[in-house]
A protein has these predicted regions:
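Conserved beta-strand-loop surface patch within small alpha/beta domains used
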Residues: 1-94, 100-169
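Glycine-rich phosphate/adenylate-binding loop
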Residues: 124-125, 138-151, 167-172, 195, ...
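A short helix->loop->beta-strand "cap" motif at the edges of active sites that frequently abuts
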Residues: 129-131, 269-270, 315-317
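A short, basic/flexible loop-to-alpha-helix module at the beginning of a structural domain
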Residues: 171-201
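Glycine-rich adenosine-cofactor-binding loop
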Residues: 189-232
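Short glycine/serine/threonine-rich phosphate/pyrophosphate-binding segments
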Residues: 209-214, 235, 302-307
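Glycine-rich phosphate-binding loop and adjoining beta1-alpha1-beta2 segment
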Residues: 224-268
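A structured beta-alpha segment of the ubiquitous adenosine-cofactor-binding alpha/beta core
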Residues: 256-294, 299-305
Length: 446
């Protein structure tokens, strides 16, 4: 018997909060209200579909022909506006309305009839054949149901609604049998621990920062990984990669297999680690990264960061970028930095428009070998890798893990994104005002 397809409607928390507030403001008493999300369909896997909103609309009171506690009707001009501006560009529609009362609401007979006709209408009236997802909430927006109609409007499937950064399944057995390994993390809540245990993380770059990061996040409870890195272990890596040995170097271990070894030392069973010993450019890497709940890039080049950011933007996945830098001042004293950046998922700024990635350097790094030699000879890029030390990488990696823990637990607000820079020997954390990272004309995120 085939497993059923899992369909989820995923809304970033900032977008959901704004939508919910706008819905509540659009009624005077306890009238029903309606709002719309226009979504991109993302086929995560053969049996998993995710709907990601690109924009939302809540009609103002003058957009209703009729509005009461028992029903509502939109004006024809407003409805035509929605069709022309959103459905014709190939987006699917999620329409959400409220019912009076508190507790789990049910779809009414009128809902069934209207939605069945509407699902058939939009799929036959537009070349892209958009799908209709409908949701009903109680008047306080505390309880809800969602469903997706087929294109003929004859039957529907259940849709999971998720209004957090992360979307994971709930395993009833895990709820009843908490893992003693994490007993001293109970202060953060059992639901938070289950979320960490189910979280699927893509790690791009399994070197000095990435390996420490994987060890730390793994011990926090993350068991599901996709590891991407084309490189093999070398002797010069041994000073900053925990548990790496000369024997691994001599056996020419790929870094992804070394990091998998670190995770499997923590979890002899119950973990799932996919290793992809290629660059992020490969189609296999891209497909696997797109299935993850969170993308972390810990590489030492701009091109891979650019690719990771583009994937995160396309599939609306949270992205965490980790990096360090060391240079020497004229008096031969070192300046050391680490940087942790999390662009906002709902848009506003990305690593490119925030100048966290140099597109010029990314272009050089993706160029053929002969171009590298040419630009190197005229001083555009250096031929020696940046210096690195274990303890600075550890500060960066552990801060990144702390940020993710805060994102999962809800005690760190990243709606506007964060960009933190640590400087040593001053031992200062500088927190960028992300308003200055915003760009209205960024080609990538606007």
């Amino acid at each position: 018997m085939n497993k059923p397809t899992t369909i989820s409607f995923h809304v970033p928390p900032k977008m959901w909060s704004e939508f919910q507030e706008s819905m509540l403001k659009s009624r005077m008493f306890n009238e029903e209200v309606i709002g719309f999300f226009f979504c991109q369909r993302h086929q995560v896997s053969k049996r998993k579909i995710r709907y990601i909103p690109k924009t939302w609309v809540v009609p103002s009171p003058d957009c209703y022909e009729h509005q009461s506690a028992t029903g509502l009707v939109l004006t024809q001009p407003f409805h035509s506006f929605l069709l022309e501006n959103y459905l014709r560009v190939g987006l699917d529609v999620v329409h959400i309305h409220t019912h009076a009362g508190r507790g789990m609401p049910d779809f009414s007979y009128i809902d069934d009839r209207y939605e069945s006709e509407y699902a058939q209408f939009i799929s036959s009236g537009f070349p892209q054949k958009p799908r209709l997802i409908s949701g009903v909430f109680d008047e306080d927006f505390q309880s809800c149901q969602f469903r997706m109609w087929d294109r003929k409007g004859r039957k529907f499937e259940k849709v999971q609604f998720c209004n957090s950064l992360f979307e994971v399944a709930t395993n009833e057995n895990d709820m009843n049998n908490p893992d003693l390994m994490f007993a001293r993390q109970k202060i953060f809540g059992e639901a938070n621990q289950r979320l960490l245990n189910e979280l699927k993380v893509a790690l791009i770059g399994c070197g000095g920062i990435g390996s420490i990061f994987a060890e730390l996040l793994g011990r926090l409870g993350v068991k599901n990984w996709v590891l991407v890195d084309p490189d093999r272990l070398e002797t010069l890596n041994l000073n900053r990669m925990p548990g790496a040995t000369q024997e691994m170097v001599e056996q020419r271990w790929h870094k992804v297999h070394y990091v998998k070894h670190l995770i499997k030392r923590i979890y002899s069973e119950g973990s799932c680690v996919k290793t992809i010993p290629t660059s992020i450019e490969s189609e296999l890497a891209r497909q696997e990264i797109a299935t993850c709940d969170l993308i972390v890039v810990a590489t030492d080049n701009h091109f891979s960061r650019k690719m990771a950011q583009e994937i995160a933007l396309e599939y609306m996945r949270p992205l965490v970028c980790l990096g360090t830098h060391i240079d020497m001042k004229q008096d031969h004293t070192p300046r050391m930095y680490c940087r942790v950046s999390v662009p906002p998922m709902g848009g506003g700024w990305c690593l490119m428009c925030g100048n966290i990635i140099s597109l010029q350097r990314a272009a050089f790094e993706s160029a053929p070998a002969e171009i590298h030699q040419m630009v190197g000879s005229v001083g555009y890029i250096e031929g020696v890798n940046d210096p690195a030390v274990f303890w600075l990488n550890s500060i960066c990696a552990s801060t990144g893990v702390g940020v993710i823990h805060g994102m999962v637990s809800g005690f760190l607000n990243v709606d506007s994104g964060i960009d933190w820079v640590y400087e040593f020997p001053g031992s200062d954390w500088r927190k960028t005002n992300t308003e200055y990272l915003r760009s209205d004309d960024c080609f990538f995120c606007c």
